[in-house]
Amino acid sequence: LNNIITIWQRDSLKSNTISGNRLHPHLKNYNISEKINFTSNLDDLDFDTLTIIAVPSSAISDVLSKCSLRDGKYIIVSKGFDINTGLLSSDLLESNFNIKDDALAILSGPNHAEEIIIGKASAAVIASKNLDYAKELQKLFSSDVFRVYTSPDVIGVQIGAAVKNVIAIASGLCVGLELGDNAQAALVSRGMNEIMSLDTAYSINVRTLYGLSGLGDLI
């Protein structure tokens, strides 16, 4: 692809270092393409095309408030709720930054960057109220080793991705405390049962929670 890609990193030293040696500190065995630009200046970003929001969910509001957002298209890969309002990321962008829901999508799933960049098979779901936009992104991100599915359930995909983290942390504690496979299996299954109960509260499709962004990401 001949797309122009610019990645913002708030730490200017890290941004300049990555730009210079083409290595990410957490992905040192992978050389970053020269076609990818790095900056620590938000004014260098072009919000007229496609913007991928990948900062922590707790920082989205602060970062975007410093940006000159325009009528481009947006995709959120952050997982979680806004720390001040309790809003999901999509609701935050719509209510506080006037981003139209038909120009907004969520990408989520059990995706480890260190596996994706070396070509290991992975899958994700892209959710948007605008299915044409979701399919457009599906085509953009799909490859022979990265399978992308689409969904209209924007809220369900975000709820599954955020809430499953609580169970994932507890599952890790089971391992660390050596409580055994029985306890871990019981915790995960009962935890999923609690997550399922959110379908009514948020008016979401329970099948979404069993999908890639919920159960898939938990596993």
What are these regions (language model features)?
Residues 3-49, 61:
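Conserved N-terminal Rossmann-fold NAD(P) cofactor-binding segment
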Residues 10, 79, 129:
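Cofactor-binding loop segments of dinucleotide-utilizing enzymes, especially the Rossmann-like FAD-
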Residues 96-104, 121-169, 173-208:
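Internal alpha-helical scaffold of NAD(P)-dependent oxidoreductase catalytic cores
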Residues 44-48, 163, 215:
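Alpha-helix C-terminal capping/helix-to-coil transition sites in glycosyltransferase folds
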Residues 203-219:
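C-terminal substrate-binding/catalytic lobe of Rossmann-fold NAD(P)-dependent oxidoreductases
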Residues 32-35, 39-121, 137:
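Rossmann-like NAD(P)(H) cofactor-binding subdomain of soluble oxidoreductases
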Residues 3, 72, 146:
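Short phosphate-binding/catalytic loops that engage adenosine nucleotides
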Residues 7, 52-53, 126:
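Conserved SAM-binding loop
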